[in-house]
């Protein structure tokens, strides 16, 4: 994949995420999937809608009986495959995601219709949860 005479080596998407239930529920799994350009990268099974302690970054006005934090997940696509937190998910490399065929990169995080665990999703941004970041899309050349 080449963009302006540079070769793309890696695409990474990271975000603090967890399941979603009313208020919070420590036993509430959800199969959370990432797609790039409408091609599935992989699914992570979130174990919980995390609560029971305050998120490290949550503002004072955020009620303690609500979801508090998530887990920082990192999807990565390289030439030799697709990975989640360093573990290989598949052999699907950069070419499969048609990145050079478009003027943009589409990223979707959600729950598949046929997911075994349809426990919803919370996506945290900078200032909430435990990690001081928004959703990050990183391209490495």
Where do the model's predicted regions map?
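Extracellular and analogous surface-interaction loops
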Residues: 1-9, 94-100, 141
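Mid-protein regulatory/catalytic core that forms ligand/cofactor-binding pockets
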Residues: 1-63
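Short, well-structured beta-strand segments within conserved domains
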Residues: 11-13, 93-95, 101-114
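Short, flexible coil/linker segments at or flanking structured domains
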Residues: 20-22, 95, 125
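Hydrophobic beta-strand residues in large extracellular and virion-surface proteins
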Residues: 34, 105-109, 137
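Extended, solvent-exposed segments with strong compositional bias
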Residues: 47-100, 117-119
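Proprotein-processing/basic-patch segments
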Residues: 112-141
